[in-house]
Amino acid sequence: MVNQFQDEKAQPIYSIIDTGRVMKMPFNGLSLLDYAINSSLAFSNIALKKKDKVGLISFSAKIESILKANAKLSQLQQIMERLYNINTQFPDSDFNMLYSNLRKRITQRSLLMLYTNFEHISALKRQLPYAGHQ
């Protein structure tokens, strides 16, 4: 007996982009936010070609933008329009607020890609309990 696996189709995939002050940091001529935007655009394009649903969430101290995951042809254009208007904010990002909003708004099993920067391992460890990790 041999198990055969099929790739999942139409899986919701969300790019979650932190627009807080830590993403303003420069790296090789671009800000970390610029790299997050470029990566999320490239990944969204590939996912749409593979017939997955893609969505976008941007946040800092509050949720700034939410685009529900969808596989429509116009979805990449909507993502580009949302990303064009993203700028870094000065307040620190509120991960507790982010995770509570994600639990309410995303009820289907989804792939979440978080674009952020933790300046120290201690900053990462402070945020893990909010994500349900010990």
Where are these regions (language model features)?
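A generic short-segment signal for beta-strand/edge and adjacent turn/coil regions
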Residues: 24-26, 79-84, 107-111
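Short, charged loop segments at secondary-structure junctions
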Residues: 65-95
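Short coil/turn residues that cap or connect secondary-structure elements
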Residues: 27, 51, 71, 87-90, ...
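Exposed acidic/Ser/Thr-rich ligand/metal-binding surfaces
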Residues: 93-134
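An amphipathic, basic-hydrophobic helix/alpha-beta surface used to engage anionic
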Residues: 1-74, 111-115, 129-130
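Short, contiguous acidic/charged loop-to-helix segments that flank catalytic cores in large enzymes
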Residues: 29-32, 85-90, 113-121
